[in-house]
Amino acid sequence: MKKTILTLAMALTMGSAWAAKAWNMPITITQPDGTTITVFQHGDEDFSWYTSLDGTILNRIGNTFTPITESKEAFFTKAKKIRRANVMRREPVQGSSQAIFPHTGSPKALVILTEYQDKKFSIKNPKRSFNQYLNKEEGKQEEFGYRESKNYGSVRQYFSEMSNGQFTPQFDIVGPVTLPEDMTYYGGTSSKGNDERTAQMVVDACELVKDSVDFSLYDSNNDGYVDLVYVIYAGYGQSMGAANNTVWPKATYVRSQAEYNGKKIYRAGVNNELIGNENTFNGEPAITGLGLFIHEFSHCLGLPDFYASTLTSSIYDNQGMEDWSVMDNGIYKYNGWIPTAY
């Protein structure tokens, strides 16, 4: 496959927020009564659901799983309405220059490491670990005790290889900073089935670093908008089976009138610190795979999801790229540590 596929970004615009699909591996979850259950998660941010190993559809309330009481047909009829509402209620992303991150040269992106009031980073020195995760120019990553060396290369190396050296993004990391609210405030699932305040997380993170960051350095075309603000948040992400009050990783947009050094925030992305949930690797925290950041960052470049994006397709005939593209399930190859190409 030609590595010049990044040039596709020139012709694409973002129509809505884009999110990683659910991790399709068996997930072990400890329920409040101490029992464990192994489930599969399906779908994406717009609507996700769980099944047992024998295919029974399960309700999830907190970490308690029970079989649905309605028929499968009734469940998915309701699910389609919820998903459709989630897609339709979004404001279309503008097709102007601020909608897409530059995709040639070495543009800079601002990355903010954020903790919650009730959840801190498990990685002892997250800035050190994520600096090599994002920016290491060659060779293996150094091991600091959180499986960093499992990641193949770095995000920057990945895009350099995919573009034959034409695109080598730079990631300026600040933080960690502590958000003003608990995790549930930002990640708690609404009645519509998705995160409540992801964009607010981005704005709050910007407020916390505004005195130490010159945001004008991140507007490459001087159009008045920061090219990208990316947040890596402490803990686990909902797409990999963590609790419903965690944030689902995604690329999104921010509707805010706030200005920093004369620049507005618009394009944003977020993803989690760690792989899986509290039971993954016997509870030993492990840094998230490169694939997750690469997938969401690719949305910021203008690339769409390649997985089945309609509920009917994902239920009955999921004939997507699967493991053959990082914009589908290739995001999670070898836990995302060795993601596939486009």
Per-range role (PLM):
Residues L228-Y230, A234-Y342:
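Extracellular hydrolytic enzyme modules, especially secreted metalloproteases
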